[in-house]
Amino acid sequence: MRLYTIGYSKKTAEEFFDILRDNGVTQVVDIRRHNTNQLAGFTKQSDLPWFLDTIAGIGYSHELALAPSEDLMRAYRKEGLPFDEFAKKLRAEFDEREMPKLVDGSALLCSEPDPDTCHRSVAAEYLAEKGDVEVVHL
C-alpha cells in the first residue's frame, strides 16, 4: 500500500490539488486536531471535502486518532519540547488508540510544509511499521 503525506502551507490551491491529482491520491486523511484553520482557506473542514471531490474526485476523512493530544501539541509548540521527544510521546499516544483503516493512495494532511517537523511523518512511519506500507512525502 502507498501512503502519502502532504502539508498545505506555502502551497496555492492550484498547487495543492494538482499535487494530489498528479500522484493518484484517492483519499485525503485530515490529521489536524483543529481543522477549521485559516492558514489556507481551501483547507477548512467545511470546504475541503467539497473541493477535493469536485476538483479531483478525491475522498475525505478526518481522523483524530492520528492527531496529537492538545497537551502534547502545546508542549511541542509553546514549551519547546524537542521533536524527537514529541515523536516518542506521540507514538505512545498512538499505542493507546485504535488506528484507522486506510485505503491505498491515502494522503495524511497537515499544515506544516516540511514533513520532518510535522506529526504526519510520525503517523506515517507508525502506520508503515504496522503493515506493508510505502510512505511518500509530497
Residue ranges and their predicted role:
Residues M1-L138:
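Residues lining hydrophobic/aromatic ligand-binding pockets adjacent to catalytic sites
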